[in-house]
Swiss-Prot record:
Domain notes: The Ras-GEF domain and the N-terminal Ras-GEF domain form a Ras-binding site and mediate Ras activation.
Gene giving rise to this polypeptide: Rasgrf2
Residue ranges crossing the lipid bilayer per the database entry: none
InterPro entries on file: DBL_dom_sf, DH_dom, PH-like_dom_sf, PH_domain, Ras-like_GEF, Ras-like_Gua-exchang_fac_N, Ras_G-nucl-exch_fac_CS, Ras_GEF_dom_sf
Name of the protein in question: Ras-specific guanine nucleotide-releasing factor 2
SUPFAM superfamilies found in the cross-reference section: DBL homology domain (DH-domain), PH domain-like, Ras GEF
Length: 1189
């Protein structure tokens, strides 16, 4: 018996599984049975050259398999059908597709298959045809033959190439041989030439003619070439390329400095603090280090790569291609974006960490490193915020000197657009963190430190020099005179005003600040401001006459110590008015917050009044306003972008008035609106307060607390026309009680039958213990105390913030002088009414007709508050920005008409009338002080017949008069000229005449110095003149006239003088060392970092270099637009501009006390002594000609 064929069944099953998953062709087919002519439907799967079939698609084991190697497949016609069965079934069978698989040898029965669709049948036949290993071998053999043929061709080409290379090398060798032969032949000819010359003597005239011809040809070629070069040098293209190259060189220098700053930040602060955080007793943890220095190290690595790329480009000069470098920088901007978003949080974390004394001590050690050059950590953290705007300015300048068809132009424009997007975010963050950095800088200047400045909610308002008048017992002023030199020297104080505190410091010779041991830090919540101190009994004329009405008094009533008084003198009436306005507004904000918290019952931990929190318009972004995360002095989010309407609405919001918003608005309103529009808004608020205030604001103004709802007296308003108004609120005094209950000391001239409430004007009181009243009020005023009566007396001993209510008051009691207590039920005053009266009429007596009904009248409250707001804004506007009214007579007349309309109100309170009269007096007075003296006035006063000469004038006289002239020119610049970059426009002389005069004066003084040096013919006289002018510059430095220092040093650095090596060799070493010191002080390196530090450490008066501030303003203007794409005002930018203008005006407002010397001034202003630049250089070449090359 023949045995059956054995095969590997397990492997066959594995192949069947692969066929089911990865088969070439799979699907149902009908297979004809071998026994009977019956068709059975099976599921077939073709894998390589093996055909499996299964009982169904889900069957795991195959029913059989066919080996297709060496077989063929062809289509067969449908078999004949019997007539049995329905006709439809026969038609269906005829339409099916039949094909047969034939095996290679005889005797093997073919495999007959069929499928329902013709397309599927063709695909099966094609797949079976290709399932042959023999066919694949044949195709492989054909490909191998082709490959071998190609390899042979390549080898042949290589051989041919080598042959050609050898031929070329042989030819090169032959060429070198022929060249050497030619050289040898030429040398042979040269040796043989003398014999031919001897034989044929040339005519001497011919020799001369040839020499002249050769000379003429050379001269003509050189002249032609010089003309070509000169024409190109003077061409616009060459000028543009020079400027472009200069921009690139400046950019490389700035990038080098920036990388060095980042290196100091990382290696001088970040890495040492990481090590300190890993110590046993860490002064700071790793999380805080990461929060402060987020991405700083990565930014340093990025810019080191960028800097190396710039230096590599310079190596290929004059070909400068920069666009690809910016293409490298742009993808890394997301690193900068993270740094920008973290910037404000970084400075807040740093301020909190500085409260740890160990960390503060360690940080001071790091900052004492000579590499830091006296700069603080927050300064280094801010440098990356200014770098992207600097790139934008550079790209602007590059594009201005790049032709439109230049290959780099599109790339540079794309880089600029991408950087501008990030720059807008950076400017917003820099604006938001300006206040934190300013506070930290002042805190670091104070030797003893000042913890209150580490509070990030403190907002810097103003600083300046004031004179503190010494006082004796009983609050009487010492008998001192304003002109006393000892008073100025010993009593000069550097004062800083913040939203919550007032700092009084003395400055040491090194520039550092020292807080006064007594009264150095004044909490404004404990202060009462007295604008016009009354004279004592011994001095009937009063201190106002003694000090020229420049003094004001701050009465401090600390809760745990005896009260004391600080008397300060301002340098001018305008300065006094500005200080008074800002201090009273800061006190006002604090008192308003405190009163609102008492009136509107809140949780003791909540400092923001409920009615402000519930107004979404004050903190929620909308289509016409966008807020930042930073809060202003009234605990309301600062405005980032807003429409003009929303800014005017914030200015006239009767619930609060932020002093920092008001100062920014008054500094920059000219950019986005006009003075006429602002005044019209104030006039509308006064005349039509109900139609000018948004409805939602009115609703929230009268909103009452949930737990203390009192009903207003039912009745109509007595009249709809304006009858009542109030002047700007001033400070109220706070007293402490033995039982530590919260009290507000208030004085009022109310009718004795009514227990109403009012606040006394502190400007009308002479001391904190005495109370005065308006002259119109004949009866003595009644003292009232508004007392919070808690249900639980145990809560009285809790430690409370000055601005918070200690507990929920159940009712208000009015304490009359006789000791009787009247319950508040006698006058049903709503919390909103009580607050409005207390704040709107702060410090003023009540009118005779003030009664219970008017107290509860909403219209009455709104009118009083609206009048208060109008007078408050006008007081700030007139006292701080008098130039607005001096230069715009129409605006001045409109304000006068509005104030006269207020004065015509028959029911105006005496104190309101006094406040209005003060504003009118400030507008109408003609101040003849020399603070308004102009350069033209001095020129007219110095018409002397004979001017002094340089030799007869001392260095001190020259320095003093230069300082006087520089400060007069500097302070004459109106602040509106700093807006809009007018000094860079084509019509700059019309838009910014005073800035252009300042620039012209700077150039004329510098030209005078250079001209006077060049006027001397002998070397010794020129050297002596240089030494004298350096001495003048050093005296200017002592006088804080850094503009004068730069005038002289720039003159000495002119090429006409700098090139005089023989003259400089005669100058002493001490003078040269002093010259280097002065140049370092006023150097432009690092955005004038040395000059900024010097100005920060000196007291006014001073004359800074104006170009430094103009650069800052141009930097801000170029970095971000004034308006967004939606047409909103970029108020963050306005805030940054306001900070710079505030610093400029700080130096403008403090005048020098230097007497004019007409002869010296006439010498300094004599234009006949000035030599122009070209003549100076020609004179310099005559004095010391160029050395032959």
């Amino acid at each position: 018996m023949q045995k059956s064929v054995r095969y590997n069944e397990g492997h066959a099953l594995y192949l069947a599984m692969l066929a089911r998953k990865e088969g070439t062709k799979r699907g149902f087919l009908s297979k004809k049975a071998a026994e009977a002519s019956r068709w059975h439907e099976k599921w077939f799967a073709l894998y390589q050259n093996v055909l499996f079939y299964f009982e169904g698609e889900q069957s795991g084991r195959p029913a059989g398999m066919y080996l297709l190697e060496g077989c063929s497949c062809e289509r067969t016609p449908a078999p004949p059908r019997t007539n049995a069965g329905p006709a439809g079934a026969r038609d269906a069978l005829d339409k099916q597709y039949y094909f047969t698989v034939l095996f290679g040898h005889d005797g093997q029965k073919p495999l007959e298959l069929r499928c329902e669709e013709e397309q599927a049948g063709k695909e099966w036949m094609e797949a079976i045809h290709q399932a042959s290993y023999a066919d694949i071998l044949i195709e492989r053999e054909v490909l191998m033959q082709k490959y071998i043929h190609l390899v042979q061709i390549v080898e042949t080409e290589k051989i041919a190439t080598n042959q050609l290379r050898h031929q070329l090398e042989d030819q090169d060798t032959e060429i070198e041989r022929l060249k050497s032969e030619i050289v040898a032949l030429n040398k042979t000819k040269e040796r043989m030439r003398p014999y031919h010359v001897h034989q044929e003597e040339e005519d001497p005239d011919i020799k001369k003619i040839k020499k002249v011809q050769s000379f003429m040809r050379g001269w003509l070629c050189r002249r032609k070439w010089k003309t070509i070069v000169q024409d190109y040098i003077c061409s616009p293209h060459a000028e543009s390329m020079r400027k472009r190259n200069q921009i690139v060189f400046t950019m490389v220098e700035a990038e080098t400095e920036y990388v060095h700053q980042l290196y100091i930040l990382v290696n001088g602060f970040l890495r040492p603090l990481r090590m300190a955080a890993s110590s046993k007793k860490p002064p700071i943890n790793h999380d805080d280090v990461s929060s402060i220095f987020l991405n700083s190290e990565t930014i340093m690595f990025l810019h080191e790569i960028f800097h190396q790329g710039l230096k590599a480009r310079l190596a290929n000069w004059p070909t400068l291609v920069l666009a690809d470098l910016f293409d490298i920088l742009l993808p890394m901007l997301n690193i900068y974006q993270e740094f920008v978003r973290n910037h404000q949080y970084s400075l807040q974390v740093l301020a909190n960490c500085k409260q740890n004394r160990d960390f503060d001590k360690l940080l001071k050690q790091y900052e004492a490193n000579p590499a830091c050059e006296g700069r603080m950590l927050e300064t280094f953290l801010t440098y990356p915020m200014f770098q992207i705007p600097r790139y934008i300015i550079t790209l602007h300048e590059l594009l201005a000197h790049t032709p439109h068809e230049h290959v780099e132009r599109k790339s540079l424009e794309f880089a600029k657009s991408k950087l501008e997007e990030l720059s807008r975010v950076m400017h917003d963050e820099v604006s938001d963190t300006e206040n934190i950095r300013k506070n930290l800088a002042i805190e670091r200047m104070i030797v003893e430190g000042c913890d209150i400045l580490l509070d990030t909610s403190q907002t810097f308002i103003r600083q300046g020099s004031l004179i503190q008048v010494p006082s004796v017992e009983r609050g009487k002023l010492s008998k001192v005179r304003l002109g006393s030199l000892s008073l100025k020297k010993e009593g000069e104080r550097q004062c800083f005003l913040f939203t919550k505190h007032f700092l009084i410091c003395t400055r040491s010779s090194g520039g550092k600040l020292h807080l006064l041991k007594t009264g150095g830090v004044l909490s404004l919540i404990q202060c009462t401001l007295i604008e016009e101190p009354d004279g004592s009994d011994d001095d009937p004329k009063g201190s106002g006459h003694m000090f020229g009405h420049l003094d004001f008094k701050i009465v401090v009533e600390p809760p745990d110590a005896a009260s004391f008084t600080v008397v300060l003198l301002a340098p001018s009436r305008q300065e006094k008015a500005a200080w008074m306005s800002d201090i009273s507004q800061c006190v006002d904000n604090i008192r308003c917050n405190g009163l609102m918290t008492i009136v509107f019952e809140e949780n003791s931990k909540v400092t923001v009044p409920h009615m402000i929190k519930s107004d979404a318009r004050l903190h929620k972004d909308d289509t016409d306003i966008c807020f930042s995360k930073t809060l202003n002095s009234c605990k309301v989010p600062q405005i980032r972008y807003a429409s003009v309407e929303r800014l005017l609405e914030r200015l006239t919001d009767l619930r609060f008035l932020s002093i920092d918003f008001l100062n920014t608005f008054l500094h920059t309103y000219r950019i986005f609106t006009t003075a006429t529009v602002v005044l019209a808004k104030l006039s509308d608020i006064y005349k039509r307060p109900f139609t000018s205030i948004p409805v939602r604001s009115l609703e929230l103004f009268f909103a009452t607390s949930q737990n203390n709802r009192e009903h207003l007296v039912d009745g109509k308003s007595p009249r709809l026309c304006r009858k009542f108004s109030s002047p700007p609120p001033l400070a109220v005094s706070r007293t402490s009680s033995p039982v530590r209950a919260r009290k507000l000391s208030l004085t009022s001239s109310l009718n004795s039958r009514i227990g109403a409430l009012d606040l006394t004007n502190s400007s009308s009181s002479s001391s904190p213990t005495t109370t005065t009243h308006s002259p119109a009020a004949s009866p003595p005023p009644h003292t009232a105390v508004l007392e919070s009566a808690p249900a639980d007396k145990a809560g009285d001993s809790a430690d409370m913030s000055p601005c918070r209510s200690p507990t929920t008051p159940r009712h208000l009691r009015y304490r009359q002088p006789g000791g009787q207590v009247a319950d508040s039920a006698h006058c049903s005053v709503s919390p909103a009414s009580a607050f409005a009266i207390a704040t709107a009429a702060a410090g003023h007596g009540s009118p005779p007709g003030f009664n219970n009904e008017r107290t509860c009248d909403k219209e009455f409250i709104i009118r009083r508050t609206a009048t208060n707001r109008v007078l408050n804004v006008l007081r700030h506007w007139v006292s701080k920005h008098a130039q607005d009214f001096e230069l715009n007579n129409e605006l001045k007349m409109n304000v006068l008409n509005l104030l006269e309309e207020v004065l015509r109100d028959p029911d105006l309170l005496p104190q309101e009338r006094k406040a209005t009269a003060n504003i009118l007096r400030a507008l109408s007075q003609d101040d003849q002080d020399d603070i308004h003296l102009k350069l033209e006035d001095i020129i007219q006063m110095t018409d002397c017949p004979k001017a002094e000469c340089f030799e007869t004038l001392s260095a001190m006289e020259l320095a003093e008069q230069i300082t006087l002239l520089d400060h007069i020119v500097f302070r004459s610049i109106p602040y509106e000229e700093f807006l809009g970059q007018g000094w860079m426009k084509l019509d700059k002389n019309e838009r910014t005449p005073y800035i252009m005069k300042t620039s012209q004066h700077f150039n004329e003084m510098s030209n005078l110095v250079a001209s006077q040096i060049m006027n001397y013919a002998d070397i010794s006289s020129r050297a002596n003149a240089i030494e004298k002018w350096v001495a003048v510059a050093d005296i200017c430095r002592c006088l804080h006239n850094y503009n004068g220092v730069l005038e002289i040093t720039s003159a000495l650095n002119r090429s006409a003088i700098y090139r005089l090596k023989k003259t400089w060799a005669k100058v002493s070493k001490q003078t040269k060392a002093l010259m280097d010191k002065l140049q370092k002080t006023v150097s432009s390196e690092g955005r004038f970092k040395n000059l900024r530090e010097t100005l920060k450490n000196c007291n006014p008066p001073a004359v800074p270099y104006l170009g430094m501030y103009l650069t800052d303003l141009a930097f801000i203007e170029e970095g971000t637009p004034n308006f967004t794409e939606e047409g909103l005002v970029n108020f963050s930018k306005m805030r940054m501009i306001s900070h710079i203008i505030r610093e400029i005006r700080q130096f403008q407002q403090t005048a020098y006390r230097i007497d004019q010397q007409p002869k010296v001034i006439q010498y300094l202003l004599d234009k006949a002594l000035v030599i122009d630049e070209d003549s100076l250089y020609e004179l310099s070449l005559k004095i010391e000609p160029r050395l032959p090359a």
